[in-house]
Each structure stands twice: as C-alpha cells, then as structure tokens.
C-alpha cells in the first residue's frame, strides 16, 4: 500500500517516488510556452474535464481567469481526484507560503501525492 511505501521512505531516508520508480523532471518548465503546452496536453486527457472561466473589464473590475474541475462530473473519471488533490494542495501550499510549514515538509507532501497518483494512468484523446 502507499501508506507502507511512505513509512519505508521515512525509515530509509528517501522519497516515496524514488521507491516506486516514479521520476519527475523539476527543470522542464523553462518558458511560459511550456506551461501553455501543458494546458493543451491537459485538455487532451481522457477522463478529465475542466472549464475555463474568464472575467475581464469592462464587465468586471479585475481581470481573472481560472480553471475549474467539477468533482461531481460523472463523465470525467479523474475530476474527483483532481478536486481532492487541489483541496489538499491549497491547504499545505497556504501553510507553506505563510511560514507555517518548512520546505522539507512541503516537499514530503508533494512526494506523497505524486507517489499516490503515479499508478493512475491516463490516456490522451486523439487529435482529429
């Protein structure tokens, strides 16, 4: 189980993702286009639906854009997982930003989440 892997990682002073063989590249974002490319790829994931909301002047005072996942969308198998992840991420991200969490703990929580979801495979929708 993932809980056992997390405990083993603590005992062995390593990460859960290392133990399960999951590798992630921390230097792959080099430009804003890399982030935009990720959004294009995200849009092609089967089982994941999201809405993009845009609020801008003159109809709104601020210019805001957001990506929304509906966790109750039955046609999107991974939306509930995204909502659970984002809910937890928002909490520990806020704690970290406000100085209530050390960077080591922040990295441990990231590693735990990546290890947990690493076995959940997704497929891309074919381009027409």
Predicted regions and their residues:
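Charged, helix-prone or intrinsically disordered regulatory segments positioned adjacent to compact structured domains
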Residues: 10, 14-104, 111-128
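Long, hydrophobic alpha-helical segments
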Residues: 2-5
């Amino acid at each position: 189980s993932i809980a056992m892997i997390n405990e083993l990682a603590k005992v062995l002073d390593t990460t859960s993702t290392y133990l399960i063989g999951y590798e992630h590249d921390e230097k792959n974002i080099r430009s804003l286009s890399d982030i935009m490319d990720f959004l294009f790829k995200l849009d092609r994931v089967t089982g994941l639906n999201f809405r993009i909301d845009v609020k801008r002047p003159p109809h709104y005072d601020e210019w805001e854009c957001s990506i929304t996942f509906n966790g109750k969308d039955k046609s999107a198998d991974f939306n509930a997982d995204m909502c659970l992840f984002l809910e937890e991420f928002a909490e520990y991200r806020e704690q970290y930003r406000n100085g209530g969490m050390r960077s080591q703990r922040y990295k441990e929580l990231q590693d735990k989440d990546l290890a947990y979801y690493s076995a959940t495979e997704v497929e891309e929708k074919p381009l027409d």
